[in-house]
Every structure is written in C-alpha cells, then in structure tokens.
Amino acid sequence: MSDLNDVQENAKLNSETRNTGKAEPPHGTTEYVAEAEISKNGVGSPKKSPKKGKVGKGDNNKVETELVHTALLEKDNPFMEEGPTGFTKSALLEIPGMRSHNLKNPNEDYEDDSEGLLPLNQESNAETCRTSLSGSINSMNGETSASEEPSVSNRKKSARIHILEAKRVSEGQGRAYIAYVIQFENSTVQRRYSDFESLRSILIRLFPMTLIPPIPEKQSIKNYGKSITGSSSKYLLPSEGSGSVDLSLSVIHASVNNSDEKLIRHRIRMLTEFLNKLLTNEEITKTSIITDFLDPNNHNWHEFVNSSSTFSSLPKSILQCNPLDPTNTTRIHAMLPIPGSSSQLLLNKESNDKKMDKERSKSFTNIEQDYKQYENLLDNGIYKYNRRTTKTYHDLKSDYNEIGEVFAQFAHEQAQVGELAEQLSYLSNAFSGSSISLEKLVGRLYYNINEPLNESVHMATSARELIKYRKLKYLQNEMIKKSLNSKRAQLEKLEAQNNEYKDVDKIIDNEMSKSHTINLERPNNNTGSGGKSYGGKLFNGFNKLASMVKDSVKYQETDPHTASINLKKEIEQLSESLEVTENDLEVISKVIKNDQLPKFSKEREVDLSEILKHYSRYMRNYARQNLEIWKEVKRHQDFA
C-alpha cells in the first residue's frame, strides 16, 4: 500500500512540475564559475558566464597561503539557509566568501525518488562540493586551479578494485586467518591483513611526504566488539553501496557471529578504499609496488618483500632517509639523530625561549592544532553521536516489532468483537511496517554513514601523522643545531686553554733563559719540628697512592691537540648534517603544506558532502514511508 502511495505522490509532484513549468536548476558549471569568480576577485558581483574561468599565471602569486581550519561550522549543514548580512554568531563563521554562497537542500534534488539509489559517481556532487565549505581546511591555497578539479571528481570513477569474498584459511595446528580475495581487472589475488599492513609500512618509507590512506586498526574480535556500539546487534546489509565500496558484492565464506561479520565487513570496506585510493595516486602508481601487490604470481607477499633488495635497503626510520628518494639515502642521512620524547620536550622549551623559526613553526603549530581539533570533532562528535543514534533506532526497531506482535495477539483474543479486532490488526501492521522501515534505515546508517565517518576519522589521523613527520624533522634539525653550537663552544674553550698554555710556556722559557743554572737544593726547614717533616712525607706518600688509584679508574685524558682535531671533525660532520636537514625540512614543509594537505582537504570535502547527502536522503525516505503507514491507519479509523 505504501509503495502505491509513493507512486501516486511522485506522479502528483511530476504533474505539478509540468504545470508550473519551473524546474530546479541542475548542478552545472555555471553555478561553479560564479562562485569561483567570487573567490578569486573577493567581494563583488559574480561573473555569470557558463564557461569555466581560467586561472592566470600570476594569480597564484597574488593569493596568500592561508592556515588550515578544521572547524565544523554551521555552514556544513546542508539545510542551513543563508542568514542576514549582519549576523555574527561567532568569529569562526566570519569567513571571507561565505556570504555569497547559497546552500541548497539536497532533498530537493531527489524529491521524486523515494527508493532509487543516490548516484555514486554523480558529477554534480563534485561540482557542488567545490563551491561549499570555502572557509574550512580546503582553503589553504586560497583558490583551486582548473587543472586540479578533474582529479577530485575522477577519484572515485577510477576505482577498479573489489574484494569479492573473505574466507577463513587454516594454517594448521588449530590456527586460522581471514583471507581476502581481491579482484583487479581480470585477475584475482588472495591477501591477508598482515599483507596490507606490510604494504602500508613500505609505502610510508618509500613516500614519506605522501599522505598514505589508512587501513583498519589491528585488533581482535573481542576488542572490536567493545569499540563498536551494539556489538551483538545484527544490521541489515543495504543493497546500495557508499563511495567506491559496495559491500553487497562481498561474500563472507565462513561461519561467523554478528561481531565477526561486522569486523570483517569493516575491514573489507577500509581495505577496498585503501587500494582504490592508492590507484588514484599518480606518484605511487609510477612505481610497480601496487601491481606487484595485486599480481597473482606473487602468492606469498612476505617472501616477495624479503627477496626484494629495494625494500630491504630502505631505512628503518623515515627520519634517516632522503625524503625525495628514500632508495638513494646518503651516508649523512643514515647518521642523522632520531628525536626522542625527552628531546622533544627540551627542544620545544628552548625553541619557545629563543623564538626560533617563528613564522614557519607557528604556521605548522596552528595547522596541527586545527587538524587535531577536526579529528576530535569527527571522532568524539559526529561519529560518536551517529553510532548512538543508530543504536537507538535499532532498539526502537525491536520495540516496534514486539509491540506489533502484542497487538496481533490482542486482536486474536478480541476476534469476537469485529471492529476492535480490525483496529488492533491495523495497529499491529503499522508497527510491523515501521519496524521493517527502521531495519532498512539502521542498516544504511551503520554501513553507509557510520563506516564512512569512521574512515574519515582515520584519514584525519593519517594527515596528522604527516604533520608529525614534519615536526620530528624540525626537532631533528634543532638537535643538530644544539649539538653543533655545543661542539663549537668546546672548541673555542679548548683553543683558549691552548693559548693560555702557550703563554705560560713562553713565560717559563723567558725565565729560564735569564739564568743558566737551576737550584736543585731543598730549601731549609726553619720550623725546627722533625715530627711535622715526617708527617708531611707520609702524607705525600698517601697522595701518590691516591693518584695512582685515580689514574687506574679514570681514562687518561687526551692531549689538547688530539681533542681539537676530533672536535673539528665532529663540527664538520654536524655542519654537513645541518645543511642536509635544513634542505629536507624546506622541501618537506613545502610539499606537505602546498600539496598534500590541500589535496586531502578537497577529498575530505567531497566525502563529507556525499555522506551528508546520503544521510538526509535516508532520513527523508524513512520519514515519508512511516508517514504513509500511519496515514493508512488513520484512514481506516476514520471509516470505522
């Protein structure tokens, strides 16, 4: 009955659209160009041209690089309408270029689509996302060049990897693991979780300045059951996917409980996204590591890694490798110190006292704080409360199902009263129908909303790891500076002592040159006390014995000349290390701030926008279906 009402309502809406002749403007390039002109030219009237704006050569120099802001503001709400020009709720909302942006309710795009799927590769999604959130973390570079736009919209179109199945494989002696069958083009390969973990570890060492997508955290079924809400709950797998992942295509060939199933599907989703994002990274795809990982001929991935001279020669720490080419690490890179926790605290204090690298350090400190706040808002805010909401809907679904059964039993007992039994039957059917609708909603919220939000949290963590790498490189540079200054001070002190010794030697030589004879006779003791003379000799004997013991315990100090030579060698090595780390730090800071973080911001904007569109559509469809169910009950009650 509800399906028939949906069809009638859709037909009514279509007829109204034809009568009025007014159609909603599609998400085209015209709207995007208008917004682009505003963002480039500042406050002013947009140029309403249907053609894409071209970015001039000098435009990039005119736009100053802004800091990254990760605050989730009211403008992120797709239902928020443009407020009056004079409102100032908070300082965070006062972002240049936001007043000229007209937000649109995404429900209006799918007003006549109650059960159809939200297009996964809708081009208008990317176009809409580019013009939204212009003041959040995606505004690092001030504007988006035309050459960068297709890479964002084509990111999900180029996804070609699917995990077809997950099966339990026995290792013998009662041990087993879950193997994932990966389909890439026309071939399939089987990999386990530790293989993905090894691949990501290698990628981090091969591309230390690149944002490597996350993989699901390594944890047991027991720990994962504690980390998710309602671990014993079973969620209906939706027929449509989210992003480039369609979990309905993946089959679990194993006898698993609800917690195991959710963990496996959680891993399937994140591992699929991990591989698909790697395929869209031009820098990584220039190498053969991804094709090697997906090659069925490399049956055992760990054996392949151990047999590769390239992988085995990589430095264990990314702080001791050449960031531009880790496979060509120099001797100086291999000797660089690795900052520890104590050195970080000490150097942070000294850097604050001396105010070293004020602008660059302050810039990245603010960026790190913004990303940390953004990650916290996602994890402990949106993701947390969406999990709680999903659990509440799941419990409500069970309550609706139970109360529907109660009304059905009551109607059976009141069968002799025809009118009352009929009303009770209608109520029973209404609650049962609402329970079914809630079950569909809960499954979509869990798999298509909560799981993508969890992935966004992990992506924010990976971005902060990239910022942390730059911070550790900065601390490494400060350690070398501190050590170099200390060695130079020691050398100056040693040279000053040598000069003093030379002056003393000159004085002695001058005194000896005046007299050719040296008086070796012992001076007369006029004290007249023989006991004191004997005691003095005994005391001198003890002093000699003590000095012999002291020399046997302590190492003999090197002569000043040798110490001076060693210090000069150390200073030369530290100077070379300082030059290398300063060049590395400059390159790392430039790549992370101007390339990796803006790219992450654009992708994050597209992902969050798609999540919000899915969320609003799911809630709207459930509300519409539930309303029709209770309208039907009311019609029967009115006729009774």
Swiss-Prot record:
Primary location recorded for the protein, binned into one broad class: membrane
Post-translational modification Phosphoserine, affected residues: S361, S363
Key words of the record: Acetylation, Autophagy, Coiled coil, Endosome, Lipid-binding, Membrane, Phosphoprotein, Protein transport, Transport
Span of domain PX: 140-301
UniProt KW Transport keyword: yes
Location within or outside the cell: Endosome membrane; Preautophagosomal structure membrane
Coiled coil: 475-512, 562-593
Any single GO CC term annotated in Swiss-Prot or TrEMBL for this entry: phagophore assembly site membrane
UniProt-annotated binding residues for a 1,2-diacyl-sn-glycero-3-phospho-(1D-myo-inositol-3-phosphate): R192, S194, K218, R267
General function of this protein: Required for cytoplasm to vacuole transport (Cvt), pexophagy and mitophagy. Also involved in endoplasmic reticulum-specific autophagic process and is essential for the survival of cells subjected to severe ER stress. Functions in protein retrieval from the endocytic pathway. Required for proper sorting of the v-SNARE protein SNC1.
Oligomer and partners: Forms a complex with SNX4 and ATG17.
UniProt domain comment: The PX domain binds phosphatidylinositol 3-phosphate which is necessary for peripheral membrane localization of ATG20 to the perivacuolar punctate structures.
Further remark: Present with 358 molecules/cell in log phase SD medium.
Protein name listed in UniProt: Autophagy-related protein 20
Source organism per UniProt: Saccharomyces cerevisiae (strain ATCC 204508 / S288c)
Gene: ATG20
